Amino acid sequence: MASFATKFVIACFLFFSASAHNVLLPAYGRRCFFEDLSKGDELSISFQFGDRNPQSSSQLTGDFIIYGPERHEVLKTVRDTSHGEITLSAPYKGHFQYCFLNENTGIETKDVTFNIHGVVYVDLDDPNTNTLDSAVRKLSKLTREVKDEQSYIVIRERTHRNTAESTNDRVKWWSIFQLGVVIANSLFQIYYLRRFFEVTSLV
């Protein structure tokens, strides 16, 4: 029978893995969040930048940074990316901070959807690490990652659909413009030929 501590760890894992968030990023700003970790804890975060403007066809990007308990200590950095997944193994106990940045653009509709897949304590001295409980935790994490990835795919599909619709609109209006040019050119040629023959007949 699993010990109370093991059950508690599993419960914590399931709780954190269910945490899904969507936040609006301020123009030329950032949004930051905190996690209290013990040494050996693993913090896994996946994210997808998006646009709350339903008509947008641009794939927006941003930056992601994880800081240690000391604000100047940068542990993980990802620059100019549309999505990603970062895993950090806490080197020591402390108050860790992670931030999503929009500091290089004035876009006011940029948002980020992110999921915390789990804060899992790994006891390297536990001989039962590879037990059924461990397998259940891993399976739960993988299941959550698949579900989160599906939510990100929805965001990407919306962006790609808007891009396709925007391209179709441009092609449609360009075709109408070309048709108008052809009709105008044909009318001009008819008018010119009629005038030409009228002048010729008068001569």
Curated annotation (Swiss-Prot):
Pfam families, sorted: EMP24_GP25L
Compartments it resides in: Endoplasmic reticulum membrane; Golgi apparatus membrane
Record-annotated GOLD domain positions: 30-118
Top-level taxon of origin: Eukaryota
Keyword field: Endoplasmic reticulum, ER-Golgi transport, Golgi apparatus, Membrane, Protein transport, Signal, Transmembrane, Transmembrane helix, Transport
Family affiliation: Belongs to the EMP24/GP25L family.
The protein's name in its UniProt record: Endosomal protein P24B
Organism of derivation: Saccharomyces cerevisiae (strain ATCC 204508 / S288c) (Baker's yeast)
